Amino acid sequence: MSSDQVHLGHRARKRFGQNFLNDPYIIDGIVSSINPLPGQNLVEIGPGLGALTEPVGRLVDKFSVIELDRDLAKRLRHHPDLADKLTIYEGDAMRFDFTQLIKPNNKLRIFGNLPYNISTPLMFHLFTFHEHVEDMHFMLQKEVVNRLAAGPGCKAYGRLTVMAQYYSRVTPVLEVPPESFTPAPKVDSAVVRLTPYEVLPHPCTNLKWLDRVCREGFNQRRKTIRNCYKALLTVEQLEDLGVNPGLRPENITLQQFVKMANWLDANHQNA
């Protein structure tokens, strides 16, 4: 058993995408950015060996955790300081119904060091509960954080950017080097804060259409808007919507994507 795969007696499981955070300075920075307070409806995804769970547990009385690895869930159940504070849900966060954690007038505050192999689909799952969430703090691949926070005209701007910014304000918090983990991942990491809007600034009448215009555009990034959407919208219709047909999809703002989606929803039967 190689020592670089083992932390606190637990061997990292590749199939769960486990990399355990072990840098006290970084841990302190993450917990400070979360700023957990007693009485808040806190939920940690993938607590692992408790790098964030333990310091958060010192600041609050009760919170929930979702852990897929049975061995790690068992460790938490027997943790001398955390056992009485935690409500442990054993299972896959990708399939978890977060509405079961809703409390009156106490929105969810979700945080975690997400497995990088599922981080993007997991965020899409979490966005479906956006109206019940106050904020989310996640450790992700730095490249994913760059995509979340990107603006139009930048290489990192894509479908994930548009969908994340449709639901929330995106704030990069801090960067994390590979040596802050055991085992060290092959990529740089970063922490991001996602704060869902109480009122969506650019509401879409049918999210299937928004997803479709994003997919069709960003799957053909080098094509112009007129060529990406020629089966859906004429040049005149694009111009009426304030979209320059000579631009590429990466130059289109969130508001323009929503305008296109809403027009298509009003004028076509199925997304």
UniProtKB/Swiss-Prot annotation:
Molecular function GO labels: 16S rRNA (adenine(1518)-N(6)/adenine(1519)-N(6))-dimethyltransferase activity; RNA binding
Protein's cellular compartments: Cytoplasm
Enzyme Commission number(s) from the entry: 2.1.1.182
Protein name, per record: Ribosomal RNA small subunit methyltransferase A
Keyword terms of this UniProt record: Cytoplasm, Methyltransferase, RNA-binding, rRNA processing, S-adenosyl-L-methionine, Transferase
Residues where S-adenosyl-L-methionine binds: 19, 21, 46, 67, 92, 113
KW S-adenosyl-L-methionine (keyword) present: yes
Family as reported in the entry's similarity comment: Belongs to the class I-like SAM-binding methyltransferase superfamily. rRNA adenine N(6)-methyltransferase family. RsmA subfamily.
Reactions accelerated catalytically: adenosine(1518)/adenosine(1519) in 16S rRNA + 4 S-adenosyl-L-methionine = N(6)-dimethyladenosine(1518)/N(6)-dimethyladenosine(1519) in 16S rRNA + 4 S-adenosyl-L-homocysteine + 4 H(+)
Major place of residence: cytoplasm
Pfam families associated with the record: RrnaAD
Top-level taxon of origin: Bacteria
